[in-house]
């Protein structure tokens, strides 16, 4: 067996004008594909550890040292992107009632949540991700990670993710990351967020 690059659940141009087809093609077919290939290459060196990346990255010290960083970078990159694609929707969706209530309980209002999430995404220096997670206490929390690090390694369950690597937005938004973040909020798959939230509680 091997880790397989998942197909996008929509056409490359389905998220336009927010996310353009050229960016989506490069992002999925080149960047994500490279993470998959490098993950497979690392796992081949230690077939005894299996291929369950979520379990492996939830307990990083148990990953053999010679492939540990490769799996953090590439295995994390694969998991992060596979989730990211599913969290985007060509059709505009309203926030589901369960997630809306949880956001209100945690942050006071949706606007406050959006402001804090945007701050996390904007404030992540260099490359990384912004996240809405369910923490170990079962509460919603906004966080960000560097590079391809995943909240799974901190015992948190991601339910919303935004890639803030420049390759995710530079062709369309150049260096104006806040405009990319604003566009992201227009194409979130809130039904998927709800499903992840229900599973994580």
Swiss-Prot record:
Catalytic reaction equation(s): 2 superoxide + 2 H(+) = H2O2 + O2
Keyword Secreted present in the record's keywords: the answer is yes
GO CC list: cytoplasm; extracellular region
Q: Which residues bind Mn(2+)?
A: 27, 81, 163, 167
Q: Where is the protein situated, by its record's location annotation?
A: Secreted
Q: Which SUPFAM superfamilies match?
A: Fe,Mn superoxide dismutase (SOD), C-terminal domain, Fe,Mn superoxide dismutase (SOD), N-terminal domain
Question: Which molecular function GO terms apply here?
Answer: metal ion binding; superoxide dismutase activity
Question: In the Enzyme Commission scheme, what number(s) does this protein have?
Answer: 1.15.1.1
Q: How is the cofactor bound?
A: Binds 1 Mn(2+) ion per subunit.
> Quick one: where is this thing mainly located?
secreted
Please indicate if the UniProt record lists Manganese as a keyword: yes
Keyword annotations for this protein?
Answer: Manganese, Metal-binding, Oxidoreductase, Secreted
Q: Which cofactor does this sequence's record say it needs? A: Mn(2+)
The UniProt subunit note reads as follows: Homodimer.
- Return the PANTHER family for the record: 37S RIBOSOMAL PROTEIN S26, MITOCHONDRIAL, SMALL RIBOSOMAL SUBUNIT PROTEIN MS42
Q: Which family does it belong to?
A: Belongs to the iron/manganese superoxide dismutase family.
Q: What does this protein do?
A: Destroys superoxide anion radicals which are normally produced within the cells and which are toxic to biological systems.
**Protein's name according to its UniProt entry:** Superoxide dismutase [Mn]
The organism encoding this protein is Streptococcus pyogenes
Gene that encodes it = sodA
């Amino acid at each position: 067996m091997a880790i397989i690059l998942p197909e996008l659940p929509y056409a490359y141009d389905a998220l336009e004008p927010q996310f353009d087809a050229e960016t989506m093609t490069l992002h999925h077919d080149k960047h994500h594909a490279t993470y998959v290939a490098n993950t497979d290459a690392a796992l081949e060196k230690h077939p005894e550890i299996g291929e369950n990346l979520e379990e492996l990255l939830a307990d990083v010290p148990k990953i053999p040292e010679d492939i540990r960083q490769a799996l953090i970078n590439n295995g994390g990159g694969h998991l992060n992107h596979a989730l990211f694609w599913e969290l985007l929707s060509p059709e505009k969706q309203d926030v589901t009632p369960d997630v809306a209530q949880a956001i209100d309980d945690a942050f006071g209002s949706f606007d406050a949540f959006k402001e804090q999430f945007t701050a996390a995404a904007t404030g992540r220096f260099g490359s990384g991700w912004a996240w809405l997670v369910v923490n170990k206490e079962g509460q919603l929390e906004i966080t960000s990670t560097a590079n391809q690090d995943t909240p799974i390694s901190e015992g948190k369950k991601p339910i919303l993710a935004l890639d803030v690597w420049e390759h995710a937005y530079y062709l369309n938004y150049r260096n104006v990351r806040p405009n990319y973040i604003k566009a992201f909020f227009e194409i979130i798959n809130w039904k998927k967020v709800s499903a992840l939230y229900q599973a994580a509680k």
